[in-house]
């Protein structure tokens, strides 16, 4: 399936441009936008208000250093991430991720789903 609505297709194109190299995030946004097509067709005011553009852009994203000492007494340094998409209806969902394989695209994917 692909995005047929012109407005949603433009939003998706912008997401890809603004978030290059984040295929997991692109996939999550594509799936959500495809599911929203009937809603957007019935509610053109959502486009006028830029609703979807606001949904797909995180309110904030934090990356931070986590230093810890392993069992051998050696200090390890990892990067932690937190992404927050939308607080309009209450607290943010999501959590913190510290695994070395995690990067911003994965965090956005997890936070957006």
Where are these regions (language model features)?
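N-terminal ligand-binding/catalytic initiation module
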Residues: 1-113
């Amino acid at each position: 399936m692909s995005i047929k609505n012109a407005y949603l297709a433009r939003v998706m194109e912008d997401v890809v441009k603004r978030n290059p190299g984040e295929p997991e995030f692109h996939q999550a946004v594509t799936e959500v936008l495809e599911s929203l097509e009937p809603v957007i067709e019935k509610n053109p005011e959502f486009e006028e208000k830029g609703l979807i553009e606001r949904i797909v852009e995180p309110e904030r994203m934090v990356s931070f250093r986590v230093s810890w000492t392993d069992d051998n007494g050696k200090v390890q340094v990892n990067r932690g991430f937190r992404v927050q998409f939308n607080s309009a209806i209450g607290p943010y969902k999501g959590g913190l991720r510290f695994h070395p394989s995690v990067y911003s695209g994965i965090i956005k994917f997890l936070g957006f789903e």
